[in-house]
Amino acid sequence: MLSHLIIGASGLYLGDMLFIGISFIVLMALISVVAWKPITKMMADRADKIANDIDSAQKSRQEASDLADQRRDALSHSRAEASEIVADAKKSGEKQRSSIVADAQNEATQYKQNARKDIEQERQDALKNVQSDVADISVAIATKIIKKQLDPEGQQALINSYIEGLGKHES
């Protein structure tokens, strides 16, 4: 049977070969027009879409990275501002505390000075009153002594009356 194929192959005619060759070329042309061009166009479109998707993904990744950097910078800036605000508040509080303490010390000093003045005035008034009382008593004693010549008993009576007079005078 194999020998029939080999013998049959040698009996292939030129017309058949030409028909097969033309059929092959026409079939290739039809496949090229109907299938090959649309398939290659579809493959090229798909390759372009994939390339665009990759570019878009890279662009999105870069935008996300830039946005993350901006957020980090903003957060860092916010933290710095918050630290600055806290530091300013501490300074302001410290100044206010110092001012309040200084005012309190000045007020306490003023109260002390006023109290000293009041005490000195009271002391001066008391001294004047004592001097006045001593002068009055001295005048009264001198008047009584001048009116009477005193013996020891008279002196004792005068002293006792004077002491009683002091007790009444102070009450």
UniProtKB/Swiss-Prot annotation:
UniProt xrefs under InterPro entries: ATP_synth_B-like_membr_sf, ATP_synth_b/b'su_bac/chlpt, ATP_synth_F0_bsu_bac, ATP_synthase_B_chain
GO molecular function terms here? proton-transporting ATP synthase activity, rotational mechanism; proton-transporting ATPase activity, rotational mechanism
Q: What is its main location?
A: membrane
Q: Where in the cell is it found?
A: Cell membrane
Pfam families in the record = ATP-synt_B
GO CC field: plasma membrane; proton-transporting ATP synthase complex
Segments traversing the membrane: 14-34
What ranges does the record give for the region Disordered, renumbered to this chain? Answer: 56-104
Q: Which keywords annotate this record?
A: ATP synthesis, Cell membrane, CF(0), Hydrogen ion transport, Ion transport, Membrane, Transmembrane, Transmembrane helix, Transport
Q: Which domain of life is it from?
A: Bacteria
Composition-biased stretches (Basic and acidic residues) = 56-97
Instruction: Point out the coiled-coil segments of this chain.
Output: none
Record's bilayer topology term? Single-pass membrane protein
Family that this chain belongs to: Belongs to the ATPase B chain family.
Q: How does it assemble?
A: F-type ATPases have 2 components, F(1) - the catalytic core - and F(0) - the membrane proton channel. F(1) has five subunits: alpha(3), beta(3), gamma(1), delta(1), epsilon(1). F(0) has three main subunits: a(1), b(2) and c(10-14). The alpha and beta chains form an alternating ring which encloses part of the gamma chain. F(1) is attached to F(0) by a central stalk formed by the gamma and epsilon chains, while a peripheral stalk is formed by the delta and b chains.
Q: Which NCBIfam families match?
A: ATP_synt_b
What does the function comment of this entry state? Answer: F(1)F(0) ATP synthase produces ATP from ADP in the presence of a proton or sodium gradient. F-type ATPases consist of two structural domains, F(1) containing the extramembraneous catalytic core and F(0) containing the membrane proton channel, linked together by a central stalk and a peripheral stalk. During catalysis, ATP synthesis in the catalytic domain of F(1) is coupled via a rotary mechanism of the central stalk subunits to proton translocation. Component of the F(0) channel, it forms part of the peripheral stalk, linking F(1) to F(0).
PANTHER family per UniProt:
ATP SYNTHASE SUBUNIT B, ATP SYNTHASE SUBUNIT B', CHLOROPLASTIC
| Protein name per UniProt | ATP synthase subunit b
Which organism is the protein's source? Answer: Lactiplantibacillus plantarum (strain ATCC BAA-793 / NCIMB 8826 / WCFS1) (Lactobacillus plantarum)
- What gene is this protein a product of? atpF
